[in-house]
From Swiss-Prot:
Keywords: Periplasm, Signal. One of its GO terms (biological process) is beta-glucan biosynthetic process. The lineage of its organism: Bacteria, Pseudomonadati, Pseudomonadota, Gammaproteobacteria, Alteromonadales. Belongs to the OpgD/OpgG family. This is Glucans biosynthesis protein G.
Length: 545
């Protein structure tokens, strides 16, 4: 089993992801379905240039590689990334003192940032910043600079910023060992209280909150070789430049330098907190090699079980997940809803599109009773909606679902994969808007899937036939007539299709049965047809043994 380890707000280094064998994925040729194809790894490989041989750069006390104090403008990080990509990849060597390098999880948690030392705390600004110490999984030295009036000032490590509890017996170092990341605070929920808004820590991972949310899914700067048998490559944000916010602004801007053996990149994040926190991302990639297995705007989440399929799960909680579905608005004007699954074997699905309008991992179930978890509160986890800026052309929204037996593992990944590889030596620009929160997508006059459940079709005796129940919620007035229901499958036999009003949900319930026959993987598609125009989600599902 391959998964991403979750340690509360922590994300792992790339060493926790190992090579994996792909399960066979079903390829649909019928235009009646959103296309789900086999992973590219199972197709004839396109020759690519091997990454330049990496060299090692030893540590230098108090060395500042990227965030040197000096003039800074909007093009500074782009120039750095371009220069970085023109040279072979360098494995940076910044070893920690032995005591910090071998910290346990509890020991690492015992090193806390002192809120009194928060950046801008004494200036009355709408944002504050706190840094994370290095140690545990977070061995990489991350440089940070503060930008004000086009001047960048390197933020050196200071042991006085941190407090160490009883678990830590040694003194913190005095050398500039850098940081492992940082978090931004804002009066997101209550005036006068600076709550966490956003975190950057671990590889290129980051995550954010809308009003009233608790941390759940994460985003990354870039995905490379996800679900590749040779192993995934994890780029890292090596340095950040954080612009000092204005007194009267609801905006904070973060610049980041990305690096990995295959690519360097420059990122700009414009963050606006709110009920749904909005982050505008502008990125420029400088590939060292051809990027044929690249994912733009990647998100990482967790799905353990729900009414959709529990796989004999022995758990008092009805549902356990950070996200319960992948929502897509494609270039043809369709709205597609694909419930997530915790499969028995690795599944990779590719939904082909041209000029996508939006996609994201959504936590649609907001009722505490559906989770019954007094600590995790999965009903508070944010959804993340990605809106491409400009025409992203041809490609596919790729969904990877990894088997897991524990909620501590992230097992869901989604991203946009361009149809054409990104050439080595090129400059590739793209931009998108992220919305983090309970309801990041407008639902005016729409019919959306609110619940998916499945079970044995005959409760009196064992049968391979499956019963599917799909509930739809109607936003707006309910018409007098029932919609027509259309259910299709790539195999097996569909029977007993029934559509009924659901007064409890102000919507409809679609029920049907599937006889798998000799199939072990079947793609399903359901649509509701109304006599008057309205936006209706198309339900997609992959059934497997």
């Amino acid at each position: 089993m391959v998964s991403l380890l979750r340690c509360q707000s922590f994300k792992p280094s790339s060493s926790l992801i190992c090579s994996l064998a792909l399960s066979a994925a079903f390829a649909l040729s019928s235009s009646a379905f959103a296309e789900e194809t086999k992973p590219a790894e199972n197709k004839p490989a396109t020759p690519v240039v091997s990454p330049p041989k990496a060299t090692a750069q030893p540590a230098n006390k108090n060395q500042v590689r990227f965030t040197k104090t000096g003039t800074f403008d909007g093009d500074s990080v782009v120039k750095l990334a371009r220069k970085l990509a023109s040279k072979p990849y360098v494995v940076l060597k910044d070893p920690l003192p032995a005591g910090l390098a071998k910290l346990s999880y509890d020991e690492y948690r015992d090193i806390r940032f002192n809120p009194v030392s928060s950046i801008w705390r004494d200036q009355g600004l709408p944002f504050q910043m706190q840094m994370f110490h290095r140690g545990f999984y977070f061995q990489d030295l991350i440089e940070i600079a503060i930008v004000e009036a086009n001047q960048a000032t390197h933020l050196a490590y200071e042991p006085k910023y941190f407090t160490a509890g009883e678990v830590i017996t040694q003194a913190l170092p005095n050398d500039d060992i850098g940081y492992s990341g940082f978090r931004i605070h804002n009066q997101l929920n209550t005036n006068g209280v600076y709550d966490e808004l956003m975190v950057f820590q671990g590889a290129s991972y980051f995550r954010a909150l809308g009003k009233g949310n608790s941390y759940g899914l994460s985003a990354r700067g870039l995905a490379l070789k996800t679900a590749d048998p040779e192993g995934e490559e994890f780029p890292i944000f090596r340095a950040f430049w954080v612009e000092r916010p204005s007194y009267d602004s609801n905006l904070i801007v973060v610049h980041a330098l990305l690096d990995s053996p295959s690519v360097a990149g420059a990122y700009r994040f414009s963050v606006r907190p709110g009920d749904n926190t909005q982050i505008d991302v502008e990125a420029t990639l400088f590939p060292r090699v051809e990027l044929s297995k690249v994912g733009l705007a990647p998100s990482t989440s967790m799905f353990l079980h729900s009414l959709n399929g529990r796989h004999d799960t022995d758990d008092f909680r009805p549902e356990v997940h950070d996200s319960d579905g992948l929502l897509m608005f494609n270039g043809r004007g369709e709205h597609l809803w694909r419930p997530l699954a915790n499969p028995r074997q690795l599944q990779v699905s590719a939904f082909s599109d041209n000029s996508p309008q939006g996609f994201g991992l959504i936590q649609r179930e907001r009722n505490y009773a559906s989770y019954q978890d007094l600590e995790a509160h999965y009903e508070r986890r944010p959804s993340l909606w990605i809106e491409p800026v400009g025409n992203w052309g041809q490609g596919a929204v790729v969904l990877t679902e990894i088997p897991t037996e524990s909620e501590i593992h992230d097992n869901i990944v989604s991203f946009w994969k361009p149809r054409q590889p990104i050439p080595a030596g090129s400059e590739y620009h793209f931009a998108y808007r992220m919305n983090w929160g309970d309801e990041p997508v407008a639902k005016t006059n729409s019919v959306v899937v609110s619940r998916t459940a499945s079970g044995r079709a005959d409760i009196a005796k064992a049968t391979p036939r499956r019963l599917f129940v799909v509930d739809y919620h109607l936003n707006g007035a309910m018409p007098d007539e029932l919609p027509l229901a259309k259910v299709e499958s790539s195999g097996g036999v569909i029977a007993n299709v029934v559509i009924a009003r659901n007064a409890a949900n102000n919507g409809y319930r679609l029920a049907f049965e599937l006889e798998p026959e000799d199939k072990d993987l079947i793609e399903l598609r359901a649509e509701l047809k109304f006599s008057t125009p309205r936006q209706v989600e198309t339900w997609l599902y992959r059934w497997t043994l």
